């Protein structure tokens, strides 16, 4: 029986909440499309503080893989197709249909652009599926490659080089997009370091926990320092906020380590709620952007008090997504929409 690691339950829930907060802050910026000057700059830096959600999910996904497996079979891939790729496609069908009605465009156009090409918020799943295949290949070659510091360093150099030239070299950018058919956010080279970082941490998990027990404060200081490095490298485009950026790689990576370290100190705090958020996190990730606009139409009345706005919006989004998920969970067929994790919840029957 696999050991239940409470810190990872808390970690998954917190990352899920961080992604929602990121999208809520984006909604505020989009509402004020004429924002400029100091207000725009402040919004830019606040949004980037919490932009690490998607990279953290990539790191966590691979950490869990190398932590829980030392060898894999073909079933490793088929399970992820059933419970990750199929839900992505089914939710994408629903999203494409709703968007076709909203924008008065064809369903086929919406489905191809969004789901197949990855030009929607669900692009993250396209990235994750590529890493599942890469992980399977590495397992078949040699599991111990996940412990390679050389591979970790090379992946960092590759990711940073790719993102730097993709951002700053127009010819390189245009060439890549000419030959790569999907959304630019799904290019594996822009996320490859997070994959190997998660793999390395999963392989050395107990050592990582021991390190954090002693040096968590130092990692927090490093997180602050790397964010100031990002500020120093900012190029003046205060509308574009993305984790697909070379200047944020150190910050995103260290923030994952920091949050993991903080989560090791949580044992029972709000555990039932945290457990539900963690179990439904994949479904929340796919569903919440669909309802975000409608919910924002109400909660933006609290915008002048940012903390109240975020708290109420977060409460409603999590409540709605988990509520829908709990109903779907009653029918086993919906595992192809909500994934398999919700069915592992230990909920008392009355």
UniProtKB/Swiss-Prot annotation:
Instruction: Report the locations given in the UniProt record.
Output: Cell membrane
Which InterPro entries does this chain map to?
A: Acyl_transf_3_dom
Q: GO cellular-component terms in the record?
A: plasma membrane
**Molecular function GO labels:** O-acetyltransferase activity
Q: Does Zinc appear among the keywords? A: no
Biological processes annotated in GO: enterobacterial common antigen biosynthetic process
Q: Which Pfam families match?
A: Acyl_transf_3
**Per UniProt, what is the membrane topology?**
Multi-pass membrane protein
Residue ranges spanning the membrane: these are 7-29, 44-66, 79-101, 116-138, 145-167, 187-204, 211-233, 243-262, 269-291, 306-328
* Alphabetic keyword roster: Cell membrane, Membrane, Transmembrane, Transmembrane helix, Transport
UniProt family annotation: Belongs to the acyltransferase 3 family.
General function of this protein = Presumably involved in the export of the biofilm adhesin polysaccharide poly-beta-1,6-N-acetyl-D-glucosamine (PNAG, also referred to as PIA) across the cell membrane.
Q: What is this protein called?
A: Probable poly-beta-1,6-N-acetyl-D-glucosamine export protein
Annotated source species: Staphylococcus aureus (strain MRSA252)
